[in-house]
Regions:
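Short acidic, Pro/Gly- and aromatic-enriched capping/linker segments at domain boundaries
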Residues: 1-12, 268-285, 512
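Short, Gly/Pro- and small/polar-rich lid/capping loops
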Residues: 1-10, 199, 507, 630-633
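Polysaccharide-binding surfaces and accessory modules of carbohydrate-active proteins
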Residues: 5, 10-13, 17, 21, ...
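Short Pro-Gly-centered flexible turn/kink motifs
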Residues: 91, 98-105, 282-301
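Carbohydrate-binding surface patches
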Residues: 241, 635-653
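Aromatic-lined carbohydrate-binding/catalytic grooves of carbohydrate-active enzymes
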Residues: 324-464, 474
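Active-site neighborhood of glycoside hydrolase catalytic domains
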Residues: 386-393, 399, 403, 424-582, ...
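Aromatic- and carboxylate-lined catalytic core of secreted/periplasmic carbohydrate-active enzymes
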Residues: 591, 597-633
Length: 653
C-alpha cells in the first residue's frame, strides 16, 4: 500500500519507491504537515514543537495553551483568518466581505487509481500504478468544504496534489486565492531555483538563497509565459547535480500562476504553488465546486539529475497521452524561416522535393496559407484556404507533397483574431476587451474569448473544415501574445479551460495528427500543454549557442522528447551569429530534431552533411528520446555545453 492511515495517531503516510510524505490530524482537528523526504518507516510527529511566541496567536479551541499557534506550526493547507500570518494557500471572501476560513478535518478516503480533474489536464495512471488519498476539510460557519487530493505514483517517486473547493453554504462566496500545494519545512536552509526568461530566451536557471521574507514569481500574462516557467526547485545550499536534497514542484497548468517561497520569523520555510491571485477573483454560487489545477511534487536525495529523471519519467509516461509520445517522430522542415509569408503552393512542393532528397520526413506549411494573409496584419480568425495563393485546393497541395514521399503539416493560431478579418467584422464582441475601452494590441492581433463556448465552436468548425480536406500529418498550434484586457476575475481561468476544451476535442477527433504546441516559441511550455501535445517548440531562438542554455534549463523538468529543436540557417535570423552546421546539428539533436531553413540555398557539401546528420539522429533517436538524460556541464558556468543520453538498460550511451 502506497497510502497508510494510522487511526490511533491520525497520521497519513504516503510512500513512493524512495520517498515518504507524512501529515497528521491533530487533537484540534487541524491538518499539520510532518515530513517529506527520504523514505522512512517512522512516525514523524516528533518534529512538531510548541512554544509561546509573542504576537503569534492561539485558536480559541486551544484554551489557555499559548504554545499552540497556527502562525508557527507546519500546515498542510493554510488559510487566511486563522492567526497564521505567513503566506497562505487559500483566501475566500463571503458576501459581507469577510475573509476567514478555518478548515478542520471531516473525513478521508483511500482508493486505488489516480484521481482525474474535470476539464483540466492531470497526471494519469492505471489503477495498479497509483493510489489516491482524498481528505475532506471544512468550515461549516463559512459554508466551505475543501477536498485535498493526493495522487501517489510509487514507481515514479512523485506525489500529485490538487484541491476541490465547494460552496456548501446558502450564499455566494468569492475565491481570492487558491494554491494547489503547500510544503512547510521546519528545518533547513534552502536555495530557490527558478527558470526566468523572455521571448526568444526562455527558462534560464537562476539560483537564489532564500533569506527572510518572501521570494515570489509567476505569470499574469494569461499564459504560463516566456518570463517564468511554472516550476520551482527548493534545494539545500550544497546540493549539486549528483548529491544533496532537493524538492520540485511543477504546475500542470497553462495560465496565470504564482509560486511563493518564504522563510519565516523562526527560520521555517514555506513553499506554495498554484493559481495567481492577481487578476483573479472567482465567484462561486451555492452548491458549485471550483477545481485548482494540479501540482506534481518530487523529492531527490541525490541531487538535481535524479530529480529531473523522476519528472522526465512522470511526464513521458503519465502526462503525455498522444500515441506519438513513444513513437519515432518525423524529422521535419518548417517553411517559416525558409519563406516567411512569401510562398505559393509550388514553393511548398519544391521544399518537399528538397526535403525528400535530404532524408527529411515532413514539410510544414507555416503562417500565411489562409484568408488574405501575406503579413501579420490580417486574417486571423478566417480559417479558409487561400487557394489563389496556393494555386489550387489544400487537398491538391497535400497530395502533391505526399507524392514527393514526405508527410504534410500545417500551422494554426486558433485563439487569435485580426481586426482586419471577416470574423472580427461580424463578431467584434468575440475579442477580449474591457467594455468601453480600446483594447491592447500585440502583433496587430487580439485574443478571442475562448471562455465562451460559441466562440470556440465557431473556430473549431472552421479548423475541422480545413483538416478534413486531406491527410494532415502534423499541426503546429501557435499563440503569439499575452492577455492584457482582463474584464473579469474569472476570465483568465475560464479562458484556459476553454483552450483545454478545444484541444481535447481536437486530439479526440484527430488522434493520428502529431500536435506540437507553440507560443512564440516557449511561452507556454508547461505540463498542461504536454497533456495534449507531446512536443512544444522550445523557443523562437534557433541560435545553437543560445539553444544550449534554453534546452539546459528546460531539461530540469521536461524530457528531451518534448523539446522542439531545429537546425536553422546562418547567420542566425535571431542573433546574427554564425555557427557550424555540425554545432547546429548536435544542439538540435538534444530535442525533436528538424530544420528551419531553405535547402535550395545550401551547397552540395552542406546538403550531404545534413543527410549524414539525419542518419545519425535516426540511429540514436529512441536512445535520445527514451533514454536517461544527463547534464554534464552548465552552459551558464562552463566554457562548453555537454550532455549525455544513456539507455534505460544502461547498455548504450
Amino acid at each position: 500500500m502506497a497510502i497508510i492511515f494510522n487511526p490511533n495517531k491520525k497520521i497519513f503516510t504516503l510512500q513512493t519507491a524512495h520517498t515518504t510524505y507524512q501529515m497528521q490530524v491533530d487533537r484540534l482537528g487541524y491538518l499539520l504537515h510532518l515530513y517529506y523526504g527520504a523514505k522512512s518507516t517512522c512516525d514523524m510527529d516528533y518534529v512538531l514543537t510548541y512554544a509561546d511566541r509573542g504576537f503569534s496567536g492561539n485558536p480559541y479551541a486551544a484554551g489557555m495553551n499559548r504554545t499552540y499557534s497556527l502562525d508557527t506550526l507546519p500546515q498542510e493547507y493554510p488559510t487566511l483568518g486563522t492567526g497564521d500570518f505567513r503566506n497562505i494557500a487559500l483566501d475566500i471572501k463571503n458576501e459581507q466581505g469577510t475573509e476567514s476560513v478555518e478548515l478542520l478535518y471531516k473525513s478521508h478516503e483511500i482508493r486505488d487509481g489516480k484521481y482525474a480533474l474535470k476539464g483540466l489536464p492531470a497526471v494519469w495512471a492505471s489503477d495498479d500504478e497509483a493510489q489516491t488519498l482524498e481528505i475532506v476539510l471544512g468550515d461549516d460557519i463559512a459554508g466551505v468544504e475543501v477536498h485535498l487530493l493526493y495522487g501517489v505514483l510509487e514507481a515514479c517517486d512523485v506525489i500529485t496534489r490538487s484541491v476541490l473547493i465547494k460552496n456548501t453554504g446558502s450564499g455566494n462566496i468569492t475565491i481570492e486565492k487558491a494554491h494547489a500545494a503547500c510544503l512547510d519545512m521546519v528545518y533547513g536552509d534552502y536555495d530557490v531555483i527558478r527558470f526566468y526568461g523572455k521571448h526568444a530566451m526562455e527558462r534560464n536557471l537562476e539560483r537564489t538563497h532564500l533569506g527572510h521574507g518572501t521570494l515570489s514569481f509567476g505569470s499574469r500574462r494569461g499564459t504560463s509565459s516566456h518570463q517564468y516557467n511554472p516550476a520551482v526547485i527548493l534545494a539545500q545550499r550544497d546540493t549539486t547535480e549528483n548529491a544533496g536534497d532537493c524538492y520540485g514542484m511543477l504546475f500542470v497548468y497553462s495560465g496565470n500562476f504564482s509560486c511563493e517561497a518564504e522563510k519565516d520569523q523562526i527560520n521555517q520555510t514555506r513553499l506554495l504553488m498554484g493559481l495567481s491571485d492577481e487578476l483573479f477573483s472567482y465567484p462561486l454560487a451555492a452548491g458549485e465546486t471550483f477545481t485548482v489545477p494540479e501540482v506534481i511534487m518530487s523529492y531527490s536525495a541525490d541531487g538535481f539529475s535524479q530529480l529531473s529523471h523522476q519528472y522526465h519519467t512522470c511526464i513521458s509516461e503519465h502526462v503525455c497521452r498522444s500515441r506519438f509520445a513513444h513513437e519515432v517522430r518525423p524529422v521535419l522542415i518548417n517553411s517559416w524561416e525558409a519563406a516567411y509569408f512569401d510562398f505559393t503552393g509550388d514553393t511548398i512542393v519544391d521544399l518537399a522535393k528538397e526535403a525528400a532528397s535530404l532524408g527529411i520526413d515532413m514539410v510544414v506549411m507555416d503562417d500565411g496559407w489562409f484568408g488574405k494573409r501575406d503579413d501579420d496584419n490580417s486574417s486571423l480568425g478566417d480559417w479558409f484556404v487561400n487557394e489563389k495563393k496556393l494555386g489550387g485546393t489544400l487537398s491538391e497541395l497535400i497530395d502533391r507533397v505526399h507524392a514527393q514521399g514526405v508527410k504534410f503539416g500545417i500551422w494554426i493560431e486558433p485563439e487569435m483574431v485580426n481586426e482586419d478579418s471577416n470574423l472580427y467584422r461580424e463578431h467584434p464582441d468575440w475579442a477580449i476587451q474591457i467594455p468601453g475601452k480600446l483594447p491592447v494590441r500585440s502583433r496587430n492581433q487580439l485574443i478571442l474569448d475562448f471562455s465562451r463556448k460559441e466562440v470556440r465552436d465557431n473556430i473549431f468548425d472552421q479548423i475541422c473544415a480545413v483538416f478534413d480536406q486531406g491527410k494532415i500529418d502534423y499541426v503546429k498550434w501557435d499563440m503569439n501574445r499575452s492577455m492584457a484586457d482582463v474584464y473579469a476575475g474569472n476570465l483568465a481561468y475560464d479562458y484556459v479551460l476553454g483552450v483545454y476544451d478545444f484541444m481535447e476535442r481536437l486530439v479526440t477527433r484527430y488522434p493520428d495528427i502529431l500536435l506540437e504546441g507553440c507560443s512564440g516559441g516557449g511561452g507556454r511550455f508547461d505540463a498542461g500543454m504536454l497533456y495534449y501535445s507531446p512536443q512544444i517548440w522550445c523557443s523562437d531562438n534557433t541560435d545553437a549557442i543560445n539553444r544550449t542554455r534554453i534546452q539546459y534549463g528546460t531539461s530540469f523538468f521536461y524530457p528531451v522528447s518534448s523539446m522542439g529543436a531545429h537546425v536553422s540557417a546562418v547567420p542566425n535570423h535571431q542573433t546574427g551569429r554564425v555557427t557550424s552546421l555540425k554545432t547546429r546539428g548536435i544542439t538540435a539533436m538534444a530535442g525533436t530534431f528538424g530544420y528551419e531553413l531553405n535547402p535550395a540555398l545550401l551547397s552540395d557539401e552542406e546538403k550531404e552533411e545534413i543527410r549524414e546528420q539525419i542518419k545519425t539522429f535516426k540511429k540514436y533517436e529512441m536512445l535520445i528520446n527514451e533514454g536517461t538524460y544527463w547534464r554534464l556541464t552548465s552552459p551558464f558556468e562552463d566554457e562548453v555545453a555537454a550532455w549525455m543520453s544513456v539507455s534505460r538498460a544502461k547498455d548504450r550511451a
